Swiss-Prot record:
Compartments, record wording: Cytoplasm
Protein name: UvrABC system protein C
Encoding gene per record: uvrC
Family assignment from sequence similarity: Belongs to the UvrC family.
Pfam families, per the entry: GIY-YIG, HHH_5, UVR, UvrC_RNaseH, UvrC_RNaseH_dom
Organism: Prochlorococcus marinus (strain MIT 9312)
Amino acid sequence: MSNSSIEKIDNKYNFKIEYKLINNKELLKSRLSEIPKSSGCYLFKDIDNNLLYIGKSKKLRSRVSSYFNNYSDLTPRLSLMVRQITEIEIIVTDSEYEALNLESNLIKTNKPYFNILLKDDKKYPYLCITWSEKYPRIFITRRRRNRNNLDRYYGPYVDVGLLRRTLFTIKKIFPLRQRPRPVYKDRTCLNYSIGRCPGVCQEVISSDDYKKIMQQVSMIFQGRNDDLEIFLQKKMLQFSNDLDYENAAKIRDQISGLKLLTESQKISIPDSSINRDIFGIVSEKNVASIQIFQMRSGKLIGRIGYSQKLNNEDENHILQKILEEHYMNVEAVEIPSEILIQYNLPKQATIEDWLTELRKKKVKILIPKRNKKHETVEMVLKNAKLELDRILNGIQDNESSIEDLAQILELSEQPKRIEGYDISHIQGSDPVASQVVFIDGIPSKQHYRKYKIKDPNVFVGHSDDFASIYEVIHRRFKKWSRFKKSGGDFSILNDKTNSKLDNELLSDWPDLIMIDGGKGQLNAAIKALNELNLEEEVTICSLAKKNEEIFIPGFTKSLDTDENQKGVLLLRRVRDEAHRFALSFHRDKRSKRMNRSQLSQISGLGPSRIRELLEYFKSIDAIRIASKEDLSKVKGLGKNSVNDIYEYFNEL
């Protein structure tokens, strides 16, 4: 690769840059001057052509150059990203608005690693209705897959418990499809007999009539309970006038159930006849708490909370980022006509235009100073402050736990980054390991890693946790052994303020690693570190489940601790999370193996076809209920294969 090359195709520029240019500021400045000054998007890529980050700017050259001007001004996360950049792709647009729209679409499609603003926040659930299917399903999911455009997602919802209860109640009020696939081949099940299902599996009800029921259900998730109640009242009156008292009674029961459901939906605000979202942000001690309240037809149907470090950014810049990312992840029809915030955003007019284009109707961003709207914003800010207090109290608790752990292990420095390792298998089958990471006492899920155990001595019927731990620790720290052999100075890792420190090293080096297990597991990890000549650099301990005993190198007995000490409780959280993550990975791996095993019994299906099937349908259950038309959409499946798969599952 040359030092730099610019290739222009229409409005797209490819700008390649060698890693060594990062440290040659004069040459780098010259290359960056070739970037256009106009508005557009920039895409950062690494040496393997993986997308690292997608951004937008009104002035591309100055924005891109700002990443390389002064590394000391960058956060550790951004510094780590910049050091991986080997190619910058530029896409020029006619306006800042077009750049925002393009950025949104590119991020949705590519999901770059460094674009996810809220990595540590849990994935909030959505409710999906599969309108693309003959008999639509309704279910809760945390993953918005690229399904058919006809399918509809509602949400996200912060309270999954409430969402589950709501869906359970809806299925009691309305006769809906209860199962992903039929129980019997030629008759209905008990749900049909008791009126819980209209006989979808045997097509007792037509597709059109069933979709009418689903349209009524969808009104609930649009916050249109009152409209639905009026509709049902008219329907009940019509049945009554026709002397069809049985169906009138069914509608009456639906109305009663709907009223109970409506009463359970949080709070009601009389001022809110218009659908609106209300954003509020408060900050303290470099931590911001953001709350989003979703009002639909005067009712609060959803509430979402985020937390974010300020990192020298103003609250309004953080709020703008949150707002942009939030609306990148919702259906266009879920964008309300009004958005209330506490003060102006840096690019407010541009964002209004972008949201209006997405929604196909006017969207207003308002900063109310008085009346009911202002009171609503104040209510959201009050909730954000309560959440911030909870977060700060948690940080304080974590700090005292880390301090106590440092005293227990007699560490010279408090462990900022703690890694936990665990092994999971069933009698040697599908052996896997997990690496979880806690930073400042909080799980950092973007740093989690999964390992498939490759040791040939670990197989079905012969498990060896010691060999597995040895392998994982050896693989994890092998690059550090190379770093030491090449003359790397480990002493700088203890100086967190060293401006010369490579942030990639800093972000990846643990202050403490914890092995789930006793003395044997600890010795296996120590053996790996000894072979890598890293035994002096890595601080390590193990935590045994029996009596929560802590073992450290050089001691045959466990440390004298109280299992309810704050430091021990922190280690237990790390250990339990490592166990959960390893078990989850093991179950997933075992499930995939069993799915492949079942599909391999079908004539003509090789590994590549099986992989295509599972990637398309995601599960064996989805393949089992798929029609021939659905199966034929899978890449590479011929007519004979489609028939073989369909007949295999329909003859079981």
